[in-house]
UniProtKB/Swiss-Prot annotation:
Region (Involved in trimerization): 121-164
Gene: HSF
Cellular component terms per the entry's GO annotation: nucleus
Pfam families in alphabetical order: HSF_DNA-bind (PF00447)
Predominant location: nucleus
Organism encoding this protein: Vairimorpha ceranae (strain BRL01)
Keywords: Activator, DNA-binding, Nucleus, Stress response, Transcription, Transcription regulation
Described purpose of this protein according to its UniProt entry: DNA-binding transcription factor that specifically binds heat shock promoter elements (HSE) and activates transcription.
Protein name: Probable heat shock transcription factor
Residues of the DNA-binding region: 9-102
Amino acid sequence: MKSDKTPKINKFIRRLYKIVNDNSFSEIQWTTDGLRFYITDKTAFMLNGLKYLSKTTEYSAFVRLLYVYGFSKSKSLNAYEEEYYHKNFKRDGDNLLPCIQRTVETKTTLLQKNTNRTPNQLQDLLQYLNNQNFKLEGEIKSLKDRVDQQDCTINGLVQLLTRIFRTNDSNKDMLLPLNITEHGSPINNELRINYDKNQVARLMADTPNIDGRLENTNIELSNNKNFLFDSDDEDSIYKTNFF
């Protein structure tokens, strides 16, 4: 029995094909021969068209995803325009869209592909990496500032508790009498303060592990440098959730 199941088209490819065919998006169009599409205005595309393809407004992430699906960047006569090509992505060729799938690349094939890329493609990838590294560096600085602030707070608490413990060692039960004597005073006329040293341990245990988070962020920043050759997962590459 023949299966009636229709070929599956990736959401990103289907939506890309839709907006290229939509005349209301003047910033992304087919070429005259209909074999390629080009972006006439990157700024306008990021503001108007990109939100229909992605939850992010990062143009470099959009370009990277095109490469993942096998698109290549063609040389454009206009420096302000970018043109992309895929043998199965063409005008009036919606029946070919199921053939466009994510490429599965090993480290060796990814290395070979990056070696054969044009300078423009490599520049786009480097720009994306630089943007991600800049964001990570900002997060690291923010975490370091929080660590410094937390250290000051902890040092202040330690000094305060040290003074309290010294007083507590000389007089374990500190009484603050209210017009009473030490002996025989009613319980409702005295304030007894007992200090428990175990509270210090609980206080230190409740301190957030910022050092661990800082170390993880540094590891992420280091891994980002190996992005071109070591990453083949779409979500980890872009930190972008395309739908």
